[in-house]
Amino acid sequence: SKTKYDSYLLRMEPFVGICAKDHPLCGKHIPVEDLLKETIIVREEGSGTRRIFEERLTASGYELNNFFRTVSISSFVSIKALVASGIGISFLYASVVTKDENIGIFTVDGLTEPHAFHVVYTRNTNAKKYSEKFLAQDV
């Protein structure tokens, strides 16, 4: 309930298209239509990453079943391995793939806009102060 909780913006996280480094999409900015011939690898139903992707896809006038093939995987590690091996493309947060030398990035209007991450805390407590202290630590 909004009366019990409050939140603040932690960061805006880039949401990017990912493919193998040698994939023709690597480094490009493309329209959604150019993705439909690809195998799309998505997170499992119920995951936030999948929800974001499906909402943006729907807003662009498309659905998962418009893709050549859809594969659902529950692990970021497995998705990255499949993408790096050239089996398909996916959409993940940039922070999940930035250090992976075998994965390339591409952008798509309407699909790869940044996503807001918020810290939610209980109102009328010291939770905000403690969360800010915790997040300020260089771990």
In which residue ranges do the predicted regions lie?
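Secondary-structure junction motif
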Residues: 40-61, 128
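Short beta-strand-centered segments that line the small-molecule binding cleft or hinge
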Residues: 1-15, 19, 83-84, 103-106
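A late-sequence structural motif
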Residues: 107-139
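Hydrophobic residues within well-ordered alpha-helices
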Residues: 35, 53, 80-86, 119
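Residues embedded in well-ordered beta-strands
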Residues: 8-9, 16-18, 24, 39, ...
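Well-formed, non-transmembrane alpha-helical positions, independent of function
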Residues: 9, 33-34, 81, 99
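Short beta-strand-to-loop elements that line the ligand-binding cleft
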Residues: 64-75
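Paired acidic/hydrophobic, glycine-rich loop segments that form the ligand-binding mouth/hinge
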Residues: 1, 88-92
